[in-house]
Amino acid sequence: MSLRVTAVLTAVLAAASVGVAVAEEPAAPASATAIRAYHDSGEWAKDFTTAFKLANKDLDKALTVKKGKKKPKGTPTLILDIDDTSLSSYDCAAKKDFIPGSNGICAVTENLPAIKGALDLAKKAVKKKVKLVFITARPENETIRAFTEKNLKVAGYTMKHTLTMKPSGVAAETSAAYKTAARKALIKGGARIVLNVGDQQSDLSGGAAQYAVKLPNPMYVNK
């Protein structure tokens, strides 16, 4: 299977080529000033739109069986990260001036709003009989699991899904290692991961997905 990790600066680069002034995504972790400028300029939203348009196209391609070809084996599965992929911590973190760790605090203390592109993608996938799996680096414990499930539901993710959280036994592992292992376990269990979407490179590294799309996030880096 081919893996395509997509940078989401297409709109930015296209605009720059015709002399339009734009705010490019600053390298993470960026300063509070740079993060706000990127957000308030509207470019962050535009880059999200570009990424999710591609994600939708990739999903359609992955589910299309060409004439004369056999349907691929395995349960078609969509993988979504949660924080700043499915739910946005921006408003909450902004109130804390984006201090290091603020997004993580927000994730387990606030009901975060849905990122529309992700919610729409999830609804579309489920409608097409694709299994939805959230893989998050949020730590696995009863309290945080219940809080996360409630937040997802309140934000609009009411469809059937599986939530995979980081077990305490692998707490020292990087997010990349944990998430790669989680995807491989799904495949071993019969899944065919058609699309993987995340805001961190660690959400996508390790492959095991037919298509992968990376969203912009200048606020922090998870390895």
Give the positions of each predicted feature:
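Non-catalytic pre-domain segments flanking phosphatase-related domains
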Residues: 2-80
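C-terminal cap/substrate-recognition subdomain and adjoining C-terminal extension
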Residues: 24-33, 40-46, 139-223
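Conserved phosphate-coordination/catalytic loops
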Residues: 46-49, 53, 108-116, 173-177
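Sec/Tat-exported extracytoplasmic proteins
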Residues: 52-66, 86, 90-94, 125-129, ...
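Surface-exposed, polar/charged faces of alpha-helical domains
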Residues: 64-71, 116, 120, 127, ...
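Structural recognition of the beta-strand scaffold that forms the well-ordered cores
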Residues: 77-81, 86-89, 131-136, 161-165, ...
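Metal-dependent phosphoesterase signature
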Residues: 87-114
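Short, acidic loop-to-helix structural element flanking the phosphoryl-transfer center
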Residues: 105-133, 140-141, 145-146
